[in-house]
């Protein structure tokens, strides 16, 4: 969603017609692959209670940003183990060619501090370098949170020249600055 907003916004800024902006937004969405891992739930204000329960010793892999169930729930793992499993899932989905270009987002789901995100990014960077994927414009921070959830999501956005150009186009806002 973040990548689609950026590329569609850049296309609109270039005065592309609505059909082109829509095409670019869809192309970007199709190029994005995400997976999340959570250590805690979040509380949606309208509900007033956590969206799901999870013990302090457990985690959930593959859950959705709104608390949708993941692919497995089990014992908490190390940051490196979590990052490696998430990268494995994304690479299996994408199967990139050597020389592919991707933007990578390591996103806090709300309560995960920046320092921990950089620990996870270290694994992402190494793993993509190992398969000869060039990382373009890495993003590490809070881009799409789930209230106070402790967790992380990884998004890999496959880039061609059109999407890369739009992603790197100037943007000036509190959320995203490219100069």
Residue spans for each PLM region:
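Internal, active-site/partner-interface "lid" segment
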Residues: 1-66
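Conserved active-site and cofactor/substrate-binding residues in soluble primary-metabolism enzymes
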Residues: 2-3, 16-27, 56, 77-85, ...
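A sequence-level detector of short, solvent-exposed, charge-rich linear segments
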Residues: 27, 40-47, 51, 80, ...
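Glycine-rich phosphate/diphosphate-binding loops and the adjacent beta-loop-alpha structural elements
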Residues: 49-119
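Hydrophobic transmembrane alpha-helix bundles
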Residues: 13-23, 54-65, 72-83, 132-146, ...
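Short alpha-helical interface elements
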Residues: 33-36, 46-53, 57, 86, ...
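C-terminal non-catalytic interaction/assembly regions of soluble proteins
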Residues: 89-179
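Charged/polar, solvent-exposed surface patches and flexible loops
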Residues: 10, 23, 27-30, 34, ...
């Amino acid at each position: 969603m973040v990548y689609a907003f950026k590329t569609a916004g850049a296309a609109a800024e270039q005065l592309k017609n609505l059909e082109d902006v829509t095409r670019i937004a869809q192309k970007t969405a199709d190029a994005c692959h995400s997976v999340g891992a959570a250590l805690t739930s979040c509380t949606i204000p309208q509900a007033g209670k956590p969206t799901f329960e999870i013990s302090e010793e457990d985690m959930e892999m593959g859950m959705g940003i709104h608390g949708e169930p993941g692919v497995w729930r089990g014992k908490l793992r190390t940051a490196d183990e979590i990052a490696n499993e998430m990268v494995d899932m994304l690479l299996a989905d994408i199967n990139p060619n050597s020389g592919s270009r991707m933007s990578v987002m390591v996103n806090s789901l709300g309560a995960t501090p920046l320092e921990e995100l950089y620990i996870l990014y270290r694994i992402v960077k190494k793993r993509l370098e190992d398969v000869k994927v060039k990382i373009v414009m890495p993003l590490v921070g809070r881009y799409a949170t789930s209230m106070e959830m402790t967790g992380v999501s990884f998004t890999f956005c496959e880039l061609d020249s059109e999407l890369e150009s739009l992603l790197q186009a100037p943007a000036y806002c509190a959320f995203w600055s490219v100069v």
